Amino acid sequence: MGDDSLYLGGEWQFNHFSKLTSSRPDAAFAEIQRTSLPEKSPLSSETRVDLCDDLAPVARQLAPREKLPLSSRRPAAVGAGLQNMGNTCYENASLQCLTYTLPLANYMLSREHSQTCQRPKCCMLCTMQAHITWALHSPGHVIQPSQALAAGFHRGKQEDVHEFLMFTVDAMKKACLPGHKQVDHHCKDTTLIHQIFGGCWRSQIKCLHCHGISDTFDPYLDIALDIQAAQSVKQALEQLVKPEELNGENAYHCGLCLQRAPASNTLTLHTSAKVLILVLKRFSDVAGNKLAKNVQYPECLDMQPYMSQQNTGPLVYVLYAVLVHAGWSCHDGHYFSYVKAQEVQWYKMDDAEVTVCSIISVLSQQAYVLFYIQKSEWERHSESVSRGREPRALGAEDTDRRAKQGELKRDHPCLQAPELDEHLVERATQESTLDHWKFLQEQNKTKPEFNVGKVEGTLPPNALVIHQSKYKCGMKNHHPEQQSSLLNLSSTTRTDQESMNTGTLASLQGRTRRAKGKNKHSKRALLVCQ
């Protein structure tokens, strides 16, 4: 992750405003000059409602508002962990947060896009649909993200998680557009991605000489917050919308009185997104040094104080995902995330490891990126989770997975996900997997005779080694990026030390080998049964 980011973005470009910097979705912006005085300001409650409609005329509406589909097939349990392919923790952490973004996930599970996609090559929406579908329907497994997700971005080294996140969001937004290159910027603001993540800023400049008002509107997909002097997200938001005085060298050149006069500039949210991506600016632009300080962020956030219209009720958002960076520089360290996969349950997603955690642990992190969703949207999309079918248990039949894979292939040629199915591996050390093995053992009254090879001296005398580890006790510790969990990944490379039993474990063996068939370079798991 360096200064040579591949994300084609830049700073928000307000005519007379430099306080806000963020990833900009496109170069389009609109400016509206007003000639009225404050007591006759055209920005009344009636006029404000229509301003964004003026910015996005009905020439072509790609995703009608309030028409996002609610999938009835979303499982209620947490999905799969993601295998670290070498310095890809930033990718895994971002994908997990997007996977548990309810409006996006429900749209992907509905397969509405793939059924109508006309792109000859794979698009990001089709690729994300395949990934989200497999991740949510593979609880207890570890899957390998498709290389197409980071194509053109990953260069074999650590990258910035925010840059990759916006790279992915922008690629999905472009996939929503028609195939031809010339697309009106108003049309871009009606895409599915903009309907989920997009909003509109209003920068209002008031000339203190003639009292004229100039309004500039600009779309956004994320919000960058300066935390240098802020102890909380609320303080950072208050600083962001605090009026700025323009005088002296920064005096405003008024287009109404045609004079260079002092003015005040106020930034507010004209429309707020369904899903807010708040980026805490922890890294310096030049050296990449990290600002390691605790910044408080709430579980519920009221965005009404930062809106242009103040005469409405609370606009409550709820936290559902957090991206965290562990380290001292943007050039190294480790990324992981926290997600709320159910209405109240939080999980820590650290590459292949998926663990239950509490909200106290979530709110005590040095967060880098925060994901909030409007409470009404969360409740609306959560209803589809309760109506969805129950997730399959650990070790469910492979035929069901293959049937789903074939179903995806028939929908669109981009949804080719054999590598995901081939790389679904069992997390052998999980308690539920061990219980499943014991259940298989109890189905047969006759216990097989096990031919057990040499057992490590540190194991109990009655221990049974199902998979002999090829790593010795004296092995060196790995860098956090290199140990995505030795016990979570499996391999088919057979060693001279391996000794497998026969009999009632034959079916379990066969299924394990099929699931691990092409994972040639991963580590062998060790399962000890008392």
Curated annotation (Swiss-Prot):
Q: In the UniProt record, what gene is named as encoding this protein? A: USP17L1
Q: Which GO terms describe its cellular component?
A: cytosol; endoplasmic reticulum; nucleus
Q: What InterPro entries does the database record attribute to this sequence?
A: Papain-like_cys_pep_sf, Peptidase_C19, Peptidase_C19_UCH, USP_CS, USP_dom
Q: Which reaction does it catalyse?
A: Thiol-dependent hydrolysis of ester, thioester, amide, peptide and isopeptide bonds formed by the C-terminal Gly of ubiquitin (a 76-residue protein attached to proteins as an intracellular targeting signal)
| Molecular function GO labels | cysteine-type deubiquitinase activity
Q: EC number(s) on record?
A: 3.4.19.12
Keyword terms of this UniProt record: Apoptosis, Endoplasmic reticulum, Hydrolase, Nucleus, Protease, Thiol protease, Ubl conjugation pathway
Q: Where is this region: Disordered?
A: 382-411
Q: Where in the cell is it found?
A: Nucleus; Endoplasmic reticulum
User: Which source organism does the UniProt entry give?
Assistant: Homo sapiens
Q: What SUPFAM superfamilies does this protein's entry cite?
A: Cysteine proteinases (SSF54001)
Q: List the protein's name.
A: Ubiquitin carboxyl-terminal hydrolase 17-like protein 1
Family affiliation: Belongs to the peptidase C19 family. USP17 subfamily.
Q: Would you say which domain of life the source belongs to?
A: Eukaryota
Q: Describe the function of this protein.
A: Deubiquitinating enzyme that removes conjugated ubiquitin from specific proteins to regulate different cellular processes that may include cell proliferation, progression through the cell cycle, apoptosis, cell migration, and the cellular response to viral infection.
Return the PANTHER family for the record.
INACTIVE UBIQUITIN CARBOXYL-TERMINAL HYDROLASE 17-LIKE PROTEIN 4-RELATED, UBIQUITIN CARBOXYL-TERMINAL HYDROLASE
Q: Does the keyword Nucleus apply?
A: yes
Q: Tell me the ranges covered by the USP domain, including all copies.
A: 80-375
Q: Does this entry carry the keyword Metal-binding?
A: no
Name the catalytic site residues.
Answer: C89 (nucleophile), H334 (proton acceptor)
EC supergroup of this enzyme: hydrolase
Basic and acidic residues composition bias: residue spans: 382-392, 398-411
